Amino acid sequence: MKIIIAGVGKVGSTLARQLSASGYDITLIDVKQQVLESNVEKYDVMAVLGNCATMETLLQAGVNNADLLIAATGADELNLLCSMTAHGINPNIHTIARICNPDYTDQVYKMQKTFALSLTVNPEKQAAIEIERLLKFPGFLKRDSFA
């Protein structure tokens, strides 16, 4: 499976590490050369320097025959535009966009097809949901010593 990860911050780097270790064909896109070089040295990935929302950069990354694009930049708007552009080039590609601004959450969910999104992810919201879920277990915060 060919996967493109746009945005190589904490989320993008973690995805690159995990997915390349699982044997996926990974191409990274970022505007920072140093970030790309660091990830290419550490993981079995390809890299493209450029703006992930431009057709030129996406084509260099191989979007025309990619199976999945993960837009994980720090800018929600860029992630949406990147996903839409990728889908415009390759209508069969699946897209996942990181959307962190709560103002966009409902709107993006309702317009998922318009934005050509297979899935949206909000890491901060997911962390909050997981913490809330764990706190529902009565013994979660209780620690026993066995020594």
Spans of features found by a protein language model:
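Cytosolic regulatory regions of ion transport systems
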Residues: 1-147
